[in-house]
A protein has these predicted regions:
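Beta-strand secondary-structure signal
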Residues: 39-41, 85-89, 147-149, 184
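Short, solvent-exposed loop/turn segments at secondary-structure boundaries
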Residues: 78-79, 100-102, 196-198
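Short, solvent-exposed amphipathic alpha-helical segments in soluble enzyme
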Residues: 56-59, 82-83, 105-106, 165-169
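A short glycine-threonine-serine/GTX helix/turn-capping micro-motif
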Residues: 7, 95-102
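His/Glu-based metal-binding/catalytic segments typifying zinc-dependent metallopeptidases
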Residues: 78-79, 83-84, 88, 97
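Acidic/histidine-rich catalytic neighborhood of metal-dependent amide-processing enzymes
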Residues: 2-79, 131-133, 137, 148-155
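Metal-dependent amide/peptide-bond hydrolase catalytic core
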Residues: 107-202
């Protein structure tokens, strides 16, 4: 299984597609196995958290739905992280180093500062189980412009909201320090813990 080269289709996606089609093939070839109506759908853009943005739930019409993914044999996941994305754009001011005292605003250094203000032990490397984290996925910049890209994850909804509030407060404090909006935060939710919905529909 491969893509046409114009889309992202990693080995985990290929394995998932293979598993699903193999299961369908098995049911078709073994009509003696009793089962209800089975519907299959494939969604794009999983890696950017937009896989079901245009999925027509009403048209699909089913009582129960499962996402099939790679994992241990027999494993069923019934909960997941609450997920958000934080994109921070920083605009600096480049001045000749020889005359930059109290004038230059180094966007790259501000980006480093923002990242340093986040909890040191709340990264994917330092957490496990139900512990949430901030994950810096991209960092680039120079004196005039810098960019930070984070994913924020937490199982608990209240802790999730606190994490978003905290990164917002960091950006606000940096802007207050410089007396202008040197850093602009674009913060948005991507998806939520499905356990809350399952608990509402027991």
């Amino acid at each position: 299984i491969c893509s046409d080269g114009t889309t992202l289709l990693g080995s985990d996606d290929k394995a998932g597609v293979t598993e699903i089609l193999t299961a369908v093939k098995f049911l078709v070839e073994n009509p003696n196995i009793k089962h209800c109506n089975v519907k299959v759908a494939f969604t794009p853009d999983e890696e950017i958290g937009a896989g079901v943005d245009y999925f027509d739930v009403e048209k699909f019409k089913c009582d129960y739905a499962y996402t099939v993914d790679g994992g241990e044999l027999g494993e069923i996941s019934y909960e997941n992280f609450n997920a958000a994305r934080a994109k921070i754009d920083i605009v600096g001011k480049s001045v000749h180093p020889g005359s930059s005292r109290n004038v230059m605003i180094n966007a790259a250094l501000i980006a480093c500062r923002i990242n340093e203000l986040l909890p040191k032990n709340e990264t994917p490397r330092d957490t496990e189980g139900y512990e949430g984290f901030y994950h810096l996925t991209k960092m680039e910049g120079n004196v005039e412009n810098a960019h930070l890209d984070y994913i924020i994850r937490d199982f608990d909804k209240m802790s999730f909201e606190k994490r978003k509030d905290f990164i917002t407060s960091i950006v606000e404090s940096v802007n207050a320090e410089y007396g202008s909006e040197v850093a602009k935060l674009n913060l948005y939710d991507e998806y939520y813990n499905m356990l809350e919905v399952l608990n509402e529909n027991k």
